[in-house]
Amino acid sequence: MGIKRLSKLIKTYCSEGVQNRELKYYSGYKIAIDASMCIYQFLVAVRAEGQSLSWGDSTTSHISGIFYRSIRWIENGIIPVFVFDGIPPEEKIHEFEKRTKRRQDINAKLQDAIEQQDQVLVSKYDRMNVKMEKSHIEECQKTLRLLNIPYVIAPSEAEAYCAWLCKSKFVDAVATEDMDSLCFGSPLLLRNFNTALSQKLPVEEYNLHKILEGLQFTMEQFVDLCILLGCDYSATIRGVGMKRAFEYIKKYKSIDNLIGIVDFPDDFKYKEARTIFFTLGTDTSNNFTNENPINTNIATWDLIAVDSASINIEAVIDFLCNEKGFDKGRIETGIKKLQKQKKVNKQTRIDSFFKKKL
């Protein structure tokens, strides 16, 4: 879910905190990618176009998306670092339950539309019914591993780990559609990053420092604002929307000061949500050595690179072509494009000289 209406709030009350850029602006950047969000977009995009990208009984749109989109980013001088979700906080269970209920409702509507032979509604609910499976994630990780493109499985929430990587200056920005990466302290958040090439959209860049400065909020007040707006770790408050949430924090400074003023539901666990936002994006939660080759293919955060020179082409062909049915010629062409981009691993932005040491 992310943070409800946060993007609109920032554009309304602090327009200087967001700006549009072309993708080429980020040449030379190392960017942490919210992998789950990325895969989900690939799965939905194929449904939206009315295609059926599959091999046998297996969907392959997620693999195709990861393969070709990564190549395009790297061709543009960008090093993607894919971050996958780990174990979610217990407080997120209620959000998963709501998603399950929504999916059941959507599936029922889909079946009704099929019975009525309403192709417009069938297409609509089919897209809404997309579910990312464990196999989708594992196949994308294998693809990245074979291509030597950096990836890591986070200890917990991917958005929190992305924020930590950015705060620690191991990457330069975070690419996700979920605005809660700002709550975890990500200095720079990029939206539309995954679709900027395919849909020719500008990348929306959110600068946390400018947002806090423009709103005249502390980080603590900003997090409380986001909890009031609605997040994954607490219930929402009936009657509190974007404008009222902003006015409450502007006037009362803290959710604690709203006790007795606002009628909080029993499951409004704002203190627990605060704790998650202020702990999951810290060194304490994320400072671990990259010892398990299953969890990551990155040896050290100070040397993040796309090692295209040592790609095992036979292994890539065996998985993508023999096992998943991709066209061998196209895959070989893609690999050649990757191997032409060796310089992207050597380009360094000036602030990388100040990267944090573990």
UniProtKB/Swiss-Prot annotation:
SMART domains: HhH2, XPGI, XPGN. The keyword Mitochondrion applies. DNA binds at R47, R69, E157, G230, D232. Structure-specific nuclease with 5'-flap endonuclease and 5'-3' exonuclease activities involved in DNA replication and repair. During DNA replication, cleaves the 5'-overhanging flap structure that is generated by displacement synthesis when DNA polymerase encounters the 5'-end of a downstream Okazaki fragment. It enters the flap from the 5'-end and then tracks to cleave the flap base, leaving a nick for ligation. Also involved in the long patch base excision repair (LP-BER) pathway, by cleaving within the apurinic/apyrimidinic (AP) site-terminated flap. HAMAP family: Fen. Interacts with PCNA. Three molecules of FEN1 bind to one PCNA trimer with each molecule binding to one PCNA monomer. PCNA stimulates the nuclease activity without altering cleavage specificity. This is Flap endonuclease 1. It comes from Enterocytozoon bieneusi (strain H348) (Microsporidian parasite). The lineage of its organism: Eukaryota, Fungi, Fungi incertae sedis, Microsporidia, Enterocytozoonidae. The gene is FEN1.
